[in-house]
A protein has these predicted regions:
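Extended alpha-helical surfaces
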Residues: 1-243
Length: 243
């Protein structure tokens, strides 16, 4: 047993229910990983930590014009290379943003394989498949147009049909109940599905790398939910309803 993992998994506080404030933030937890040292922990912390930096960089980038903006210095090189005006000119903005996120997810999967995590590549495959299906449904595609999820890892691939169908049904109720409350419920449904996937994959009480990874991925979701300002959340949901 790796003493670093045992120490961290006994030190980190229990995770709360969805919607409650975690006792530790994701950046704080990643800081604890870095304090333990080791290439595996540093790579895991750097890769997961790049997500918040990427969100900030994308928000700053779209607010500025090509004349005033420059490649974000805080991002790792594999992401900085995508913030190139000539490269961006070949894409519609939405397609470019999708490509940037695909690069981050791809790096997470690669990092997982590099450090011996089975869960990280499986989570990336599940999350990106879910996002792809939701995008197709938002664009008016039917269930028959949705690709099957493959995880390229041992174990049975999860079935996303029920998740996407329930999300679609919740959105369809908006005509009768009002779009914003239904959008809130649809978003909560997705967050519960994400937590359910991680719970099913979590090798609890093993003090393994993937138990630590599962903790961090759950904390990522809970921390983001707790940090979402109410008005910002309503604004995001209004945009989601309009899609």
């Amino acid at each position: 047993m790796d003493n670093r993992r045992f120490y961290l998994l006994t030190l980190l506080p229990p995770l709360p229910a969805l919607g409650e404030q975690p006792a530790v933030t994701l950046p704080e937890a990643l800081g604890l990983l870095r304090q333990q040292g080791g290439r595996d922990f540093e790579l895991l912390a750097d890769t997961l930590g790049a997500e918040n930096e990427l969100r900030d960089a994308l928000a700053e980038w779209v607010r500025n014009t090509p004349v005033t903006r420059s490649a974000p210095a805080a991002l790792p090189p594999f992401l900085t290379a995508l913030f190139d005006e000539e490269r961006i000119a070949d894409f519609a903005e939405d397609a470019w943003v999708d490509a940037v996120w695909q690069a981050w997810f791809g790096e997470v999967a690669h990092a997982g394989r590099s450090i011996g995590s089975r869960l990280l590549p499986r989570w990336v495959a599940w999350e990106t498949a879910l996002r792809s299906r939701l995008a197709r449904r938002r664009a008016g595609g039917g269930a028959e147009d949705e690709p099957r999820v493959t995880l390229d890892e041992p174990g049975d691939p999860p079935d996303l049909d029920a998740v996407v169908a329930a999300w679609h049904a919740a959105r369809e109720q908006g005509a009768a109940e009002g779009p914003l409350p239904v959008a809130v419920e649809a978003e909560l449904l997705l967050e519960r599905a994400r937590l359910d996937f991680l719970d099913a994959e979590d090798p609890r009480y093993s003090f393994s790398l993937d138990e630590l990874v599962a903790y961090l991925l759950k904390l990522r979701l809970l921390d983001r939910r707790a940090r979402l300002e109410p008005e910002a959340g309503r604004s995001l949901l209004r945009r989601a309803v309009a899609l």
